[in-house]
Amino acid sequence: MIYRTATFRDVESIHKIVNGYAEQGLMLARSRNSIYETLRDFVLAEDPGEVVGVGALHLVWAELAEIRAMAISPDYAGKGIGYKIVQQLMEDARKLGVKTLFTLTYQPGFFAKSGFYEVPKEQLSQKVWKIRRCVKLY
C-alpha cells in the first residue's frame, strides 16, 4: 500500500469513493469542483494503480484544522488503511503547527481509535459550526 498526496488524476477516484458513502447517508457529498479546490488537502492510500482510501486535512485558521472526507473503498475496509491515513494527516497537522485538530463525523468510534474525543458543540467557535452540518462533533 502506498500513501501519498493527491494529484489531479485522482479527482475521479476521490469523488467516487466519497460520494459512494454520501449516497448511503454516511458522510457529506463532495462535488468535483470542491475536490479540485481542496486537492492539496488530500492524502490517499493506493493499492498499485487503484485509489482505495482518502482523507483530507483542511486548515480552518491559525492553529486549527479539520480532518474531513475520510473514506475507504468497501473492499478495503477494516484493514487499517483509514487509521494510517488519519495518522498521516495528524503528522501533517503537527508539522504545520496545528494545536487543535477536529472532525465532524457520523463515525465517532473510528476517530476515537486515534485519540479523538467528543466535545459539546458549545465548546467550539461559531466559525467551526458554520463549516458543515453534521450529527457529531468530534
Question: What would you call each of these model-derived segments?
Answer:
Residues 29-42, 47-48, 53-64, 68-72:
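A conserved beta-strand-loop-helix scaffold within acyl/acetyltransferase catalytic domains
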Residues 10, 71, 75-76, 80, ...:
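Conserved functional loop/turn residues at catalytic and ligand-binding sites
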